[in-house]
Amino acid sequence: MISEIKVRSEKEGDLLRGRDPVALAQEMAHHPIAGISVVTEPSHFGGQIGLLRAVAAAVDLPVLHKDFITTEQQIEESAAGGASAILLIAAMIDPELMIPLITKARRYSLETLVEAHSFAEVKKIEQLDFDLVGINNRDITIFEVDDTDVGRTEELARFCKGRRPLISESSIGTAGEVRRAGKSGADAVLVGTAILQATRMADILAELTSVGWPV
């Protein structure tokens, strides 16, 4: 499981509620998670590149940089900020433009997570040479305000099986949903809002990571 630090969302509003995001990341790191995702997009999610730097410096886990990354300069900023991997969104980048971004990321020893939300996007990226494939259960083009569930992963996972690990992203908040993602073919899940909104973060992290893998 990848746990996420996100300041706010268009759908849920303030997610930090006055808490220190670095302290939250350190608490997450005490649980058996694979890494931490940090959202730095400012306009819709309230992030900043300084948040990536602070979290990466504070935890001994791989850190995924999530933003609307479309330029090589942003990849350089990801590397300088301490990221281990970056997100590239198929809905926002044509394949021919994604190729130099993947090449640039590899030069900086950054893994690439390429995210799709539809069958057309899965087909669009399948021939590219990247590291991890993600299925976003929500629609990032409308800033994830849609009401969806892990059904999107169940629908698309069979088209993503192969040489790359598959990550089910968003709309996951219970052990049952983690199991559904795993049974559909996902190798991992990325969970953010549900963890940050939980009354006791330690309890939901324990619940989600207790599912084990493979499901």
What annotation goes with each model-predicted range?
Residues 76-81, 100-104:
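Active-site-proximal loop->helix
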Residues 52-54, 85, 179:
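Extended, folded domain segments that form the structural surfaces/walls around functional sites
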Residues 80-97, 134-144, 184-205:
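Glycine-rich phosphate-binding active-site loops on the catalytic face of alpha/beta enzymes
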Residues 167-170, 190:
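Glycine-rich anion-binding loop/nest that anchors nucleotide
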Residues 1-63, 70-73, 104, 109-132, ...:
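Conserved N-terminal beta1-alpha1 strand-loop-helix module at the mouth
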